[in-house]
Amino acid sequence: MNPMRVLSLLACLAVAALAKPNGRMDNSVNQALKPSQWLSGSQLEAIPALDDFTIERLENMNLERGAELLQQVYHLSQIHHNVEPNYVPSGIQVYVPKPNGDKTVAPLNEMIQRLKQKQNFGEDEVTIIVTGLPQTSETVKKATRKLVQAYMQRYNLQQQRQHGKNGNQDYQDQSNEQRKNQRTSSEEDYSEEVKNAKTQSGDIIVIDLGSKLNTYERYAMLDIEKTGAKIGKWIVQMVNELDMPFDTIHLIGQNVGAHVAGAAAQEFTRLTGHKLRRVTGLDPSKIVAKSKNTLTGLARGDAEFVDAIHTSVYGMGTPIRSGDVDFYPNGPAAGVPGASNVVEAAMRATRYFAESVRPGNERSFPAVPANSLQQYKQNDGFGKRAYMGIDTAHDLEGDYILQVNPKSPFGRNAPAQKQSSYHGVHQAWNTNQDSKDYQ
């Protein structure tokens, strides 16, 4: 049976059961639906057909409605635990941005030959970004662009100083429309802190997986393990053919790309016996399709250090802890302050990380151990300070909460007092916390 028909069949089954005169389900159906969320017939009928379920549609819904819809679809997919992934994209495009705004673009299987032509590539830090949503969304496109710009500014800081450039120069495609839209907020303002920021050089690679996930069917049915293994093998090949150190690689994944990044890191370890230095998940997604008897998803142990930023736990994101340390801006919720829909909420993790990458902003997001925003507020934000973003300490563990601004600059850079324990403790969520915490 086509796996994508499972959701429709389950929906019909649930509608028929709910339509019984006594309003109760027989034991077999009742058992089959556990632990899914109960839905009325009208709610099930309101769920759009897969062909109509697009990122644009989610962007046109308010945050609460979009989060509710995604929760319903996810729970339906988990009823029988038999929605198997079947999509492994081919011809994934990769690009390497240049300081002048140009890009080197090639399919994944051709990029290594292009990299060999770049002088000194891989001698310093290499950051690999795996996108998880299509760039057809302006929200997604902008967040990814901000992250790339931030790294280009960070890696070319010394060159900027030598040529007298300031922070007003962004590295991006030099079209009129993009120039018109660039630097619309204070997160990119050049400050005195930049003058004192540490100099660092490196290279950035963007694996644009998200552009292959242009339908919900592809997104939901993505085979995370096989796609990640493909990227992991590519990283091994790159390290070997370019004779570059593997311990300078930082792998970053957005949304479902976070899980693919984790799988890629696992494949790298399987093939080499070594772990990558760091994997960062930017709002890791819920996983709809899962292979039986296989643990899937970003997790601690995928690299020497795994960190995750969760900005739409009850929307596009997942409530499942994904790293050695998990950060929850404004606590676990459907979204974060200033995000009007689930797509914007999901991409805020990328915006926050991008802000921390910019020279001088490395410690703009101080956080403290807590398992809810309520607990954070009860302690007035006091606790052992840790920093979310590029400067996160690699020996950090546990759950961390922080508050963020609704608009850029998002980081509050608020003080936090010391406590005896350095590590946060993984605790159960406070299920009584309501949605007001993220408004």
Curated annotation (Swiss-Prot):
Location(s) in or outside the cell: Secreted; Vesicle
Domain of life: Eukaryota
Phenotype of the disrupted gene, per the record: Viable, even in combination with null mutations in Yp2 and Yp3.
Cross-referenced InterPro entries: AB_hydrolase_fold (IPR029058), Lipase (IPR013818), TAG_lipase (IPR000734)
Induction: By beta-ecdysone; in males.
Keywords noted in UniProt: Phosphoprotein, Secreted, Signal, Sulfation
Key word Chaperone present: no
Family according to the record: Belongs to the AB hydrolase superfamily. Lipase family.
Name this protein carries in UniProt: Vitellogenin-1
